[in-house]
Amino acid sequence: MSVINGSDRNAVQIKPSAEGSFLVSGVLTFETAPSVWQSSVTLLGTLSNGGEDITFDLQGVSHTDSAGLALLIEWMRTAREQKKRITFKNLPPQMLAIATVSGLESILPMV
């Protein structure tokens, strides 16, 4: 399953790469985050409840802002509600800088 949102210029893709792992690519900004959130709720809902690890690999994210970080926080909340463990890999430098300045770096489960 692949989730694609936004115009060609701001397309965001979430593609499964392994069991419970997803590759995220594109632009995560105020413009794209709401539609990515809506699509990802459906995607996360298709995973079985409880006990499953979820990993989002953000290596393919080309640009992000604070809305991208907010999206990660929402994914964390949703995973916790579904009793799943979530981790993030390869956070873009912009997102890591925003998380650090916001004091959120320590709560992000990164590998």
What are these regions (language model features)?
Residues 109-111:
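Short acidic-hydrophobic, aromatic-tinged amphipathic segments that line or gate anion-handling sites
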Residues 4-41:
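STAS-typified acidic loop motif
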Residues 27-107:
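Amphipathic alpha-helical interaction surfaces in cytosolic regulatory modules
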